[in-house]
Amino acid sequence: MRKYSPLMVQGTTSDAGKTVLVAGLCRLLANKGIQVAPFKPQNMALNSAVTEDGGEIGRAQALQADAARVKPHVHMNPILLKPNTDIGAQVIVQGKAIETMDAWGFHDYKKLAMPYVLESFSYLSNNYECVVIEGAGSPAEINLRENDIANMGFAEAADVPVIIVADIDRGGVFAHLYGTLALLSESEQARVKGFVINRFRGDISLLVPGLEWLEEKTGKPVLGVIPYLHGLNLEAEDAIKSEQLDKGKFIVKVPVVTRISNHTDFDPLRLHPEIDLQFIGKGDSLSGADFIILPGSKSVQADLEYIKSQGWDKDIERHLRYGGKVMGICGGYQMLGEHLADPLGIEGVPCRVKGLGYLSISTELQKQKQLTLVEGTLALPNQNAVKVKGYEIHAGVSTNLGKEHIPISIHTKDAMRYDGTINDENSIFGTYLHGVFDEPEAFEAILTWAGLEKCQAINMHDIQEEAIERIAKSMEDSLDLSLIWPDVFEKNKAY
């Protein structure tokens, strides 16, 4: 197996474009026939993905694996932090949750985490021809440098070259790049191979004097300037993506709870031309919706109380009274039930609380998570059964207390199992499946059930593929990658 130099992409800030840049590089290398894997030593996100072997990684790394045309693997994101309070997060190591830690606890744990990070990187290096690595936040955060495993601490330990990307759309790009480099140690500066400027709009000739100044002051080349790509429909890692090209007439409202998880579930709705998807924040109302969906949550009991504090439970009651439909996904499904019990204190203090009481289910949180990729059939009332795909990430086990309709049949190696509940009035539907809207047939079935006439789904896989290819083409045109991989790419004018 031929080997190519690994490369680490670090950023001057969060949301500088590291995730997209790594995805684009993975696709460019894959298009050249190179077996490439993405890698992020440490990620913090509430959006996670499930691997085939039942592990949990950041959704960004699953997206990057798709860009590389390989299957997601737990070693692509060995340390995942999922915040469940303002000061604490569940720590997931090589796909498995170990415990919840506060900031100081994890700071001390990083010394123990580095061997897992290096083990995962070694696995990828041995099994792929090239590894493209994503940093986290900025490498110049002085307070986080001790025992760092996410940025230069990893780069030094693994001896990998680095490029630094900055978002010019935010302003201050030269201060960001020059200042970030200046705050690094001499050995760290030496492994920086160059800079990339992201999201540029306008005439690049006006930028050239600044680029020349930066190269002269730092002695580092600018590898290129990537233009701002409008309408790039990729999953957002952290912030909820609410941009819509067109707003349809069918209004879907999603209450934004404090620990909302896997909000990428709603991307097929956001991109659909007949749907007006609205994320409803603090102080706003759910009134006026055609369809209300309660999202997943990392802290179900706390977010249930938040829903009540905002008066959204009253909005839901009124919505149902006038014939509206309501759906709950994962944590949202649990909230719609009779009770939520947490005897082990998984989410904090052991307790048992009342749910919204719309579905005859009772949920108990357990230490062992359910982490599964799912395929099966969805049979909503008065509709033909259709194909459904998705994934489960939850610690709760829900027991059906009545004889309400269970709409989803899941195919497993051993036997059939079942998921979800629909109430007798056919107005409320709950499921544990994240990604339930991604399969076109399931999308059409659920939205038809919810009241959208003549519903026709969009193909999320095709939309993602188009976006990844756009990124790759833009980077191929904009960057001089011969400075990193001279045996793969021809020399290109950087600017």
UniProtKB/Swiss-Prot annotation:
Keywords: Cobalamin biosynthesis, Glutamine amidotransferase
Database matches in Gene3D superfamilies: 3.40.50.880, P-loop containing nucleotide triphosphate hydrolases
This protein's record includes keyword Cytoplasm: no
Active site per UniProt: 330, 434
All copies of domain GATase cobBQ-type, residue ranges: 249-442
Any one Pfam family match given in the protein's UniProt record, by short name: GATase_3
GO molecular function: ABC-type vitamin B12 transporter activity; catalytic activity
Gene Ontology BP, a term: cobalamin biosynthetic process
Pathway: Cofactor biosynthesis; adenosylcobalamin biosynthesis
PANTHER family the UniProt entry points to: COBYRIC ACID SYNTHASE (PTHR21343:SF1), DETHIOBIOTIN SYNTHETASE (PTHR21343)
UniProt family annotation: Belongs to the CobB/CobQ family. CobQ subfamily.
Task performed by this protein: Catalyzes amidations at positions B, D, E, and G on adenosylcobyrinic A,C-diamide. NH(2) groups are provided by glutamine, and one molecule of ATP is hydrogenolyzed for each amidation.
Protein's name according to its UniProt entry: Cobyric acid synthase
